[in-house]
């Protein structure tokens, strides 16, 4: 049974429609990535944020362990948080579809840390050093931004598997403050932040899992790469059909100091400041 919790959509503004169309184009491009670039993760190739799988995980005797490395300086990320009310049923669906085929050669995102990356005050490509006083000032500025944001009503548009093995949920906005607007407000609030950010201004996506190796040989008729790509497409399609149309409400903006590289993705060491969105649409 598909995970549906749909309600009739609210009207959206012209700017939101424009951003929704921009997201559709982005998601179409992401969907083509696996076919255009192949399954790079099967060759232990580059994964997210210019890192390789061996930078992120060790796979020994069928057991996956994240490689936690201290981030110098800590990354300072602003993310929207997806409550476990929504993430847990999605996580369960992901595991039902993918676990039988990958056993432990897969890393499932912690369902208590599902998030949407918005804006970095400092990231691994362009580190921006900050004192404790400056960090507290950044956090206060982010809190002020959150107080002016309206909670987002969002709907899962599609599931995508990238060539780097990241299984993503790609979302659209039904109502509330658009991600592009949130990022623009954070840019203004954090003037020292890197000019080049990691993601498109309109995108709204969250990681569900990372595939780390080949599917179980016992479930494959042959080790042929094209057959594996076909299997990946089939699994993505199964999950897509289960959870497409799933709706959620996002009402928290987090300011996160990631003391370990990709701490949010790998259950690493971090400090989280949680801010409720304060806008009332009444």
Role assignments for model-derived ranges:
Residues 2-282:
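Histidine-dependent nucleotide/RNA phosphoesterase domain, centered on the 2H-phosphoesterase fold
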């Amino acid at each position: 049974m598909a995970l549906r919790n749909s309600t009739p959509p609210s009207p959206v503004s012209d700017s939101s429609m424009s951003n929704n169309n921009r997201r559709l184009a982005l998601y179409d491009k992401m969907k083509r990535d696996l076919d255009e670039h192949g399954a790079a993760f099967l060759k232990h190739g580059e994964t997210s944020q210019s890192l390789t799988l061996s930078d992120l995980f060790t796979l020994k005797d069928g057991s996956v362990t994240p490689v936690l490395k201290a981030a110098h300086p800590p990354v300072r990320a602003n993310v929207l948080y997806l409550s476990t009310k929504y993430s847990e049923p999605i996580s369960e669906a992901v595991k039902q579809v993918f676990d039988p085929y990958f056993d432990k050669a897969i890393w499932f995102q912690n369902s208590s840390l599902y998030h949407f990356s918005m804006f970095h005050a400092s990231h691994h490509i362009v580190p921006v050093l900050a004192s404790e006083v400056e960090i507290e000032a950044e956090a206060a500025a982010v809190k002020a931004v959150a107080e002016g944001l309206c909670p987002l009503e969002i709907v899962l548009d599609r599931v995508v598997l990238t060539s780097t093995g990241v299984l993503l949920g790609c979302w659209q906005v039904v109502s509330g403050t658009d991600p592009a607007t949130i990022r623009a407000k954070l840019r203004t609030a954090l003037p020292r932040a890197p000019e080049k950010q990691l993601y498109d201004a309109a995108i709204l996506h969250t990681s569900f899992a990372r595939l780390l190796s080949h599917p179980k040989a016992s479930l494959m008729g042959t080790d042929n790469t094209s057959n594996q790509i076909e299997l990946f497409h089939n699994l993505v399609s199964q999950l897509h059909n289960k959870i497409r149309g799933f709706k959620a409400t996002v009402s928290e903006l987090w300011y996160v100091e990631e003391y370990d590289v990709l701490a949010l993705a790998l259950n690493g060491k971090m400090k989280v400041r949680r801010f409720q969105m304060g806008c009332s649409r009444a």
